[in-house]
Amino acid sequence: EIGGEFSELRGYLLAKLAWDPYCNVEAHMEDFCKGYYKEASPYILEYIKCLHDAQDKFGKRLDIFGGPQDAKKTFLTQKLVQHYDKLFAMAKEAVSYDKELLLRTETAYLPVLYAAIVLQYGSRNKRLERINQFARIARATGLKMVEEWKITVDQFVTDALAEL
């Protein structure tokens, strides 16, 4: 079971901060992404930057007690989600030669897919494509539950398909 959005990066940064609370977090984040995501790292780092910039602009954060609906008018607007989609498309293309790197990159993309599905962004075909992508990636990673353990992946997918 994966441990949430960017769980590997979070663990790495927490370890670095435990050793040196005054370390350069940005430098360590870049170092981790270059090593873990390889050629996808510039796009993933840009996604993280865009997400943080939008959150800062609106003074809004998404926490475990909220949902995508809470950020629909801030950092999860349809326009921003389309931008995140493009960044991850480039990231996936950059590592398409390696199944493991591609799965790591797709795993990082799961939260974007989840938000877009919940917010029902895009045409019916685009929404169906996202649902199918989410299901495939979730199964490949072994993800069983979503929404802080409220619902299984299979039930989430079934519900999303029913709302098409």
Locate each region found by the language model.
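Catalytic domains of carbohydrate-active enzymes that cleave complex glycans
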Residues: 13-164
